[in-house]
Amino acid sequence: RVGVTGGSYGGYMTNWIIGHTDRFRCAVSQRSISNWISKFGTTDIGYYFNADQNQATPWINHDKLWWHSPLKYADKAKTPTLFIHSEQDYRCWLAEGIQMFTALKYHGVEARLCMFRGENHELSRSGKPKHRLRRLTEITNWFEKYLK
């Protein structure tokens, strides 16, 4: 029994992999990216981030953005997934997690969304202690539910 988790780029890869294999019994996607089109120009990294990561923009080779978006493959996902996002994350916006969460629910996949108010992209490293504890509890409970 194997689970998968990742945050930020690892969250993107978690979203990606659940749409490409059913190998994992469960997943935890943290502060993730699901849609390169909607993410364009919204990150605090800078306007160049999408073009750098995908060699595409909404105006140039825009199909490539969709092909690289985990949301495109959400209809193939079967893995129960917990999404963890912070409301004040300006690197990987909450909407990215909500899109993937909603897509999984729409396609009948068990999913849970856990949002943290007053936290940002650094929740796991420098968030409020009570929120860091809750995050770890949510992850542990999810893995225990599906991996036992």
Regions found by a protein language model. Name each.
Residues 1-148:
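Active-site-proximal cap/loop segments of hydrolase catalytic domains
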